[in-house]
Amino acid sequence: MNENLVKRVINFFGIQPAHIHNVEKGYRNSSYHFTSAEGHDLNLIFYKNESGILDRIKRSDQISELAFSRGLPVRHLYDTRILTLKNSHKTIYARLYHYLPGQTIAWEMYSMKHIKLLGQAMSDLHSTIKDSSAQLPLASNELLDQHAYISEYFANPSIQKAVQTKLQLRINQSIFDQFKQAILIANELPSQPLHLDLVRGNILYSSHKLEACENTADPIWQISDLTISGLIDFEKSARGHVIFDLARSYAFLLADCANKTPDKIYKYLIHSGYNKRGSSYADFDRHLFDGLVSYYLFYDFYKFLEHNPYEFLNQNHHYLRTRDILIDRKVLKSS
């Protein structure tokens, strides 16, 4: 997105930009932090056009606006309008938000405090948005759709051969039924709105004490000098049991935190963070939880294979971590 177009879009919202700071590009969107002529820090987001994205934007913002109105530091709207940009090739949607301070962290920077705060933030978010009336998709349906196409992907004989010859791996074929059963069982549990993407890129940390946000008396997610200053990207929000959210974040932490044991990560995230520091309490079957964690890890493994040449995967730290964890969990076998 060229800077002239970005400025024109900002002008459409009735704002004169004084300085555009940077752009952050993700899978779904491009995010521009800028300061207005009046001195306000704002965030312009361009959303990638894909099936259902407009409804997804509206649903996710409905959830985050509720969380903000109840005192949580989450991304929230500056302007309620959605701008549509079209040309002969594509359609892009743009929306304007308040800017949240803080930074995401590198995977090797995770400490016990970071993980505990993540657990607390998720717990508080769950209790805050529990009664939302937003019409969200079911988390189980989202996962079953994923399950269908990864099953088809790995059923392809040429893919099976490439996995064996280029990656020296075999897939435990029984896991596909096990994953489906875990998703279906979790679907029968009590449900509520979830974030479903509380991973490193969507959590903003600050290493100094923050001023209270306008809706809270004090910073609410803080341990000594470390604070979670914001949660962003609610686009994957869905309805389901909290086990889905916890399993997603735990799986991601397993791959990120090579210097911490799985038991320590579980303790920091769920026992110390979610249950003790947070305002919700998670009680679930550990075997079911582990099944969902393995599913999320396997889905991440699939994405590595789908989007990268197999020959270069052994140079990817997170692929190697995910592969080794899946071998330990008996999902993959070295051949």
Where are these regions (language model features)?
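Active-site activation/catalytic loop segments of kinase-like enzymes and analogous catalytic loops
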Residues: 243-279, 294-310
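All-alpha amphipathic helical-bundle segments outside canonical DNA-binding/catalytic cores
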Residues: 281-293
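Active-site acidic catalytic loop and adjacent metal/ATP-binding pocket
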Residues: 27-35, 43-44, 180-244
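A cross-family kinase active-site recognition segment
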Residues: 108-167, 191
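A conserved alpha-helical element in kinase catalytic cores
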Residues: 46-92, 113-116
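A glycine-centered beta->alpha junction motif in the catalytic cores
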Residues: 94-108, 156-159, 294-312
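ATP-binding glycine-rich phosphate-binding loop
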Residues: 13-35
